[in-house]
Amino acid sequence: MTTPPSLPRHARVVIVGGGVIGTSTAYHLASMGWQDIVLLERHQLTAGTTWHAAGLMVTYGSTSETSTEIRKYTRDLYGRLEAETGQATGFMPIGFIEVASDKDRLEEFRRVAAFNRYCGIDVQEISPRQVQELFPLAKVDDIEAGFYVKEDGRVNPVDVTMALGKGARMRGVKIYEGVPATGVLQKNGRVTGVRTPYGDVQTDFVVNCAGLWARELGALSGVAISNQAAEHYYLITETIKDLPPNMPVLEDPSAYGYYRQEGGGLMVGLFEPVCAPWKIDGAPTDTPYLDLEPDWERMGRHEEILLRSGKFHARPEADRRRGARTARLLCRSGTQFHRHPDGRRSRPCDGALDH
């Protein structure tokens, strides 16, 4: 029989959600000198959607100075977190290439690159031939150019989360797994605590980092959070013979996808232009590590673009594949939000991030 956790009666901050967002929030609050921080996770760390995130670490692409600075900081953090905590992050600075397939995108990406250089990112415009040298499987006969950041790359999302969690614990944060938040206590329009099956924790601040479940958690205190889960797909090929090691991540917005190495094969990820909503009435809470059965009929035409007419020289091995259908979080504006959702105090929300 599992011993019930012994929760503190009070914490200055209670963070709900143990994915990469929740552990990062805990780590950074503690790094800023905040004390008496508690993180609650319903299942295990990473068990929501973090565990199957693609792990792309990309600084290129934003025309927001704030977003660009966050990306730069994050890349630096992932590079030093292992030395700080002794926990690997899986950060591999293998490079990132975004390809422009027409004149309009070329003009757009040149503007983005100019802004990113202004912000201190070393973006290089490279020729189609150089794209193929870096990513030999790329089809480059119909692209205008690539935009290459050598220092970008990929991480292991589970390792990053564990490293952030370890760093948070080293700074005094208490992390409790297997403890769901079942209610948010309030008085006079302010949060006063969090209810769990193991007792209430009185608190001054609740940070909603519940990701796919952020809307449901917000509803417990009457806060409307405008996000919705949507289906999200990727393929993993079997081993591809003679695949060069450490190829950069390649992204092609005209094919709605990206390509990166996964083991001895490739992960081919899809960003559908029209997403399919998933569980409009709320995501299930009793199933950790969600892994949904692929809808091949719906995915088929996008798969054809990615593997046949996209920027990818398909090999026979790529036809033997494992598909994955997961749930991805979208918010109404299409961007992240970090705020008090209803203007009232003590309810910060980091719940509408797509990692």
List the predicted regions and their residue ranges:
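Beta1/beta-strand and adjacent pyrophosphate-binding region of the FAD-binding site
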Residues: L7-I21, V38
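Dinucleotide-binding Rossmann-like beta1-alpha1 core, especially the glycine-rich loop
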Residues: G55-L134, S254-Y259, G263-G265, D286, ...
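Glycine-rich phosphate/pyrophosphate-binding beta-alpha loops
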Residues: L56, S62, D152-P157, Y256-Y258, ...
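Short beta-strand to alpha-helix junction loop
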Residues: E69, V99-E107, F147-K166, Y176, ...
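Central helical "cap/lid" subdomain
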Residues: G199-P248
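Active-site lid/adjacent beta-loop-alpha segment flanking the redox-cofactor pocket in flavoenzymes
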Residues: T239-L329, S333
